[in-house]
Amino acid sequence: MAVDNDQQATRGDQLLTCWGASEGTAGMANQVRGVALALGVPLELHQTILKYPWRWFPPRFIPWKPEVFVDSAQFTGEPRLVISCGRQGAVASLAWKRQLKDRVFTVNIQDAKVSPDCFDLVCVPEHDDLRGPNVITTLGAVHHMSPARLAEARARGPVHGLERLGPGFVTVLIGGPTRLYAFSESDYQKFSEQLRSLVRAEKRLAILPSRRSDPRWVARLQQDFGRDQYVWDFVSPNPYCEALALGSHLVVTCDSVSMISEAAATEKPLYIAYLAERRAPRRLGQFHRAFEAAGIARPFDGTLAEWTYASPDPTAVVAAAIRDRLRAATVS
């Protein structure tokens, strides 16, 4: 369990006890953290890990009880609001709801593959198929890249190696292999040549691979660009927020809804680097097309242009829905 002390509670929400639940991955925890930050409430973040064999079961087949978790003691409190993300976080939320009933308001981020009616509110991106009276859809995924956080990063300026690039660099975010994208050698050849086109146009690059990135890609990026550009080495602190805030343009590989959504928070020209498909990405393709149709993103071809757009700010949309539903629940 961890408490986010940097969360600033608004006067009306100071007494609202908010717990977060996820299996602890950075992406899921950051989605929970982002919603709590947008609400302006202090967050107590719980890592909810299911015992064996329950961790391998779909949520609908798991008993919604504290006993199925490694740390069942964390279910002794009584939060007013629970924000969960991911399969194991969703089961924890369902367990709290089973215990506390209407005394807790449960919000689940992502489709937990159980009826949305099991939660008070479910939040999913528009490209998911889930719909219902208590389902809120957003353009893109919720995240923790708030305007305030980006402004703080801009004020800090370039750090952790970004200083070498000077102003106006291009931020490049690299995901990793999924069931839809292999990140193959031919993908690398095409993508690296597009990056070289930017270098030939006298652009500086801040290349940030992720924990999911293929080690072969990371090694090649270091070899091909590490000398004259910036490539995060997984040793020094990751200047992710600063790279988003300070980059003039952003290039993001197509595999990650979260990274593309976070990049859109900057309202800067955003390019999606498309890779060869292992199979047709139906829902992810809908997400890409929606971002392009909204004028937020364009396909990356090794050239840059200028355009503007308003951030879809899915986190603020979700926070507003939670406030409205909580207010209605309190009145009733």
Locate the predicted segments by residue.
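Short, basic, low-complexity termini and linkers enriched in Ser/Thr/Gly/Pro
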Residues: 1-14
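Active-site and donor-binding regions of nucleotide-sugar-utilizing enzymes
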Residues: 20-143
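A donor-sugar binding/catalytic signature common to diverse glycosyltransferases
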Residues: 23-25, 240-281
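Short, aromatic/basic amphipathic alpha-helical patches
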Residues: 33-36, 95-97, 121, 216-225, ...
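A nucleotide-sugar donor-handling region in carbohydrate enzymes
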Residues: 116-184, 300-312, 316
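Conserved catalytic-core segment of nucleotide-activated headgroup transferases in glycan assembly
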Residues: 168, 177-208
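Catalytic donor nucleotide-activated moiety binding site of glycosyltransferases and closely related
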Residues: 202-236
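Leloir-type glycosyltransferase catalytic cores
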Residues: 208, 288-332
